[in-house]
Amino acid sequence: MGVVLARGAFRERSMLTLPDFPLPDARGRFGPYGGRYVPETLIPALEELEAAYREAKKDPAFLEELDHYLRQFAGRPTPLYHAKRLSEYWGGAQVFLKREDLLHTGAHKINNTLGQALLARRMGKRRVIAETGAGQHGVSVATVAALFGLECVVYMGEEDVRRQALNVFRMKLLGAEVRPVAAGSRTLKDATNEAIRDWITNVRTTFYILGSVVGPHPYPMMVRDFQSVIGEEVKRQSLELFGRLPDALIAAVGGGSNAIGLFAPFAYLPEGRPKLIGVEAAGEGLSTGRHAASIGAGKRGVLHGSYMYLLYDHDGQITPAHSVSAGLDYPGVGPEHSYYADAGVAEYASVTDEEALEGFKLLARLEGIIPALESAHAIAYAAKVVPEMDKDQVVVINLSGRGDKDVTEVMRLLGGEL
């Protein structure tokens, strides 16, 4: 005889809610950014998705089940950890790490994929597709597809397949089909193009689990809402640990989901908002053209169905993004980040590949934590600003993922020498 769960068995401690933020507006816009720039054939699917999401967001049964899986499967809440040795080394503010690296699958991506997979099941879709760069989103989608018994196809650029061979094997082990993409720069942009083509072809049976706060409305809103659990926890944990909100929040920004998850619960506060700092990938330097700093060195335009800051040349062609981190080499940044940048809600900086590698090594040696190369960008920028702050100030760095997936690539780049 099987175990029968009692009514309300998914409920533990506090009940999850998905916040209602002031933006986007009814047209899916954050100021001028966002919207739906897609083929007419996709509009009904996006409208269906938005309606299903808004209904699910208010359904206690959906929220209860999501809360259960976030706690019991993913491992939430994650600690807000005082990095004492790092704080002492920098000699300025007290540094706390939001430990998203401790989640199941090793990164923040699971917050979003659990939500979208439950939504796919609710909508009666049996097949899910995804794009992935570093492979973390792909692994996360393959994981939730296995959990809920969904067919899964993941698109990944050939260059990223090479850099992230371990994650490719993980996805296959979890039952997903990985389809390498040979077009263009063979990275995340090209994988996204192929995933969108698949969705257009199979829209009636397939749910596209988009991995970042990009794409057409309602994706930037939906992914932001699912990731906002990061910032909501930081709010509560900060009050418990030091009785007030932090002075600054720092997170790496590619498409921008880990950063928006941290920032959004603070961004719309009427007063007392911490300084919000997003760190883009400067790659080999902004002047070289080999970078992924869409806000720092890009222009406004449309990519993958959304109006936002992105990288393109004088002919309007998207330029290949470059970063040592496979998860940051996307040539655009989400519309809400674009809005934050223009409105002065957050500030955006960038660090080079070389600086990120130093951050990677520094955290490992001082705190015994090997960060993802994405997160290492946030560490590297913190190294510049934390020493200038007062010792009674508090900085929270979002440690969006662990670095297991990057160790082989870092070893190759450093020639095995530390």
Swiss-Prot record:
Q: Which residues carry this modification: N6-(pyridoxal phosphate)lysine?
A: 109
Q: Which UniProt keywords apply?
A: Amino-acid biosynthesis, Aromatic amino acid biosynthesis, Lyase, Pyridoxal phosphate, Tryptophan biosynthesis
MF term (GO), any? tryptophan synthase activity
| Catalysed reaction equations from the record | (1S,2R)-1-C-(indol-3-yl)glycerol 3-phosphate + L-serine = D-glyceraldehyde 3-phosphate + L-tryptophan + H2O
**Pathway assigned to this chain's UniProt record:** Amino-acid biosynthesis; L-tryptophan biosynthesis; L-tryptophan from chorismate: step 5/5
Quote the InterPro entries the UniProt record gives.
Trp_synth_b_CS (IPR006653), Trp_synth_beta (IPR006654), Trp_synth_beta/beta-like (IPR023026), TrpB-like_PALP (IPR001926), TrpB-like_PALP_sf (IPR036052)
Instruction: Give one Pfam hit by family name.
Output: PALP
The entry's cellular-component GO terms read:
cytoplasm
HAMAP family linked: Trp_synth_beta
Full protein name = Tryptophan synthase beta chain
User: What species was this sequence derived from?
Assistant: Thermus thermophilus (strain ATCC 27634 / DSM 579 / HB8)
Q: What is the lineage of its organism?
A: Bacteria, Thermotogati, Deinococcota, Deinococci, Thermales
Gene behind this chain? trpB
